Swiss-Prot record:
ATP binds at G125, T126, N127, G128, K129, S130, T131. It comes from Rhodospirillum rubrum (strain ATCC 11170 / ATH 1.1.1 / DSM 467 / LMG 4362 / NCIMB 8255 / S1). GO terms for biological process: cell division; cell wall organization; peptidoglycan biosynthetic process; regulation of cell shape. Belongs to the MurCDEF family. Gene3D superfamilies: Mur ligase, C-terminal domain, Mur-like, catalytic domain, NAD(P)-binding Rossmann-like Domain. It catalyses: UDP-N-acetyl-alpha-D-muramoyl-L-alanine + D-glutamate + ATP = UDP-N-acetyl-alpha-D-muramoyl-L-alanyl-D-glutamate + ADP + phosphate + H(+). Pathway: Cell wall biogenesis; peptidoglycan biosynthesis. It holds the Pfam family Mur_ligase_M. Cell wall formation. Catalyzes the addition of glutamate to the nucleotide precursor UDP-N-acetylmuramoyl-L-alanine (UMA). The keyword Cytoplasm applies. GO terms for cellular component: cytoplasm. One of its GO terms (molecular function) is ATP binding. This is UDP-N-acetylmuramoylalanine--D-glutamate ligase.
Length: 477
């Protein structure tokens, strides 16, 4: 059995756990055997049954009137970030906690309290944070630093194996998590970008920006702030941080080389943090980091790792071997001159914009559970689209935006979209053609997650490749 983060400082205390998904169960496992009195709950009977099977102590936290209610003794509630605690409507357990003055925090906060002897690198942003987090982890591993990578990306914080003294935790931090980490002080904190997303959950754009800014909240020893300044909200945060005493701020941009910062204009990575600008790498040669958005991710990762003490040569060599992440402009296959790109992680228009910029002849598969703002912002890329194939709940709204500007089909399902897009691309036989799944929508209307959506796309493309090969003279049937 893997070792878990030691949480013995909670021995003898009562802690609630609200939400028994991946992070909640990891918390329950980490607290087991520490002498902490755990009171766990989830609204889902299925998740409660799974927790019960692991002997997790269950208690209905929505009931504060029972004689056995733990509320009078609770020191805090470890909160699953996906459960609303303020907007649009706070969960009843959050209301009770607020009325009783019981603090809410997430699993990452427990990690931060338990491992004050380690370094923390935190990454947030509307888009690009998973790639940047994985890239930083890849670089630190190449530099032979003891490191664990996770948070919002993959591994829950309390599923990490304990690192040695001065090891480094590299954490992807969502806006939901950043509202619940009062103890986290990042030694290097990275903000990539801010565009409208999750607005209902944060009560509007101001609340969303405020949540993102929490990554720079710290105690008397502020860490280094790495801020990409290519959007107005991020630039405003950068300027405010520069006015703080004792705070080192490194600006990053793909539009121009910031004074004393790091630039990636046209994919040319340049470091001016030591004064005189120095060319570092040509990012356009790294196939797993295509496009200006990935150059921003790479520049931010470079800046963060340099501030963490990693040599520039090691960083650049590690970037060249970065394998990339699935569902982020992932080349699934090239079949008879047509590339099939899985960008299922593009769950909003800004993310889809980043992918569309990279290709000139696009058969675009889009739609799903719509996000606020739709796809009006993508009009500068409509000329790249040979045809749009619309799926899911957003299809009618997307059709209204595209009609008369882009040839389109409301196909309903991903299966039909892939089939029809492939047929059209092969028929047209235009060099450089791409069938691009970049939905600009969440996936939950038809899939369990963006990963599920991307996996189905992969399977459909594999079926196409098999069928196409079998149909050729001499092909296997």
């Amino acid at each position: 059995m893997a070792k878990l983060i030691p949480l013995y400082q909670y021995a003898g205390q009562d802690l609630g756990i609200m939400g028994l998904g991946k992070s909640g169960m990891a918390t329950a496992r980490a607290l087991a055997g520490t002498g902490t009195r755990v009171h766990a709950w989830d609204d889902s009977p299925i998740l409660r049954d799974a927790a019960r099977a692991e002997s997790v102590p269950l208690c209905d936290l929505t009931d504060q009137t029972s004689r056995t209610s733990p509320w009078p003794a609770l020191q805090g509630v470890v909160w699953s970030p996906g459960i609303p605690h303020t907007f649009p409507q706070p969960h009843p357990v959050a209301v009770i906690a607020h009325e009783r003055g019981v603090p809410l925090f997430c699993d990452i906060d427990l990690l931060a309290r338990a491992r004050q002897d380690c370094f923390f690198l935190g990454i947030t942003g509307t888009n690009g944070k998973s790639t940047t987090t994985a890239l930083i982890g890849h670089i630190l591993k190449a530099a032979r630093h003891p490191v664990q990578v996770g948070g919002n990306l993959g591994t829950p914080a309390l599923s990490f194996e304990p690192l040695p003294f001065h090891g480094t935790y590299v954490l992807e931090l969502s806006s939901y998590q950043l509202e619940l980490v009062p103890s986290l002080c990042c030694d290097v904190a990275v903000l990539l970008n801010i565009t409208p997303d999750h607005l209902a959950r944060h009560g509007g754009m101001d609340g969303y920006i405020a949540a993102k800014r929490q990554i720079f909240r710290c105690g008397p020893r502020p860490g280094v702030a790495v801020v990409c300044i290519d959007d107005e909200p991020s630039l405003a945060i950068h300027d405010a941080l520069c006015r703080e005493n004792g705070r080192k701020v490194v600006a990053v941009s793909t539009r121009a080389l910031p004074r004393g910062g790091v630039g990636a204009v046209d994919g040319q990575l340049v470091d001016a943090t030591q004064g005189r600008p120095r060319a570092v790498a040509d990012l356009t040669t790294i196939a797993t980091l295509p496009g200006a958005h990935n150059w921003q991710n790479a520049a931010a990762a470079y800046a963060a790792c340099r501030q963490h003490g990693i040599d520039a040569k090691i960083i650049v060599e590690a970037m060249a071997s970065f394998p990339g992440l699935p569902h982020r402009q992932e080349l699934v296959a090239e079949i008879d001159g047509v590339r099939f790109i899985n960008d299922s992680k593009a769950t909003n228009a800004d993310a889809a914009d980043k992918a569309l910029r990279c290709y000139d002849t696009v058969y675009w598969i889009a739609g799903g559970q719509p996000k606020e703002g739709g796809i009006v912002s993508l009009e500068p890329h409509f000329h790249r689209m040979r045809q749009a194939y619309l799926i899911g709940q957003a299809a009618p709204a997307f059709e209204r935006t595209l009609k008369g500007k882009v040839p389109l089909s409301q196909v309903g399902t991903l299966t039909r979209a892939v089939t029809e897009a492939a047929k059209a691309a092969w028929r047209d036989a235009i060099p450089g053609a791409v069938v691009l799944l970049s939905p600009a929508c969440a996936s939950w209307d038809q899939f369990s997650s963006f990963e599920h959506r991307g996996d189905i796309f992969r399977e459909l493309v594999a079926d196409l490749a098999h069928t196409r090969a079998a149909a050729k003279p001499g092909g296997r049937r």
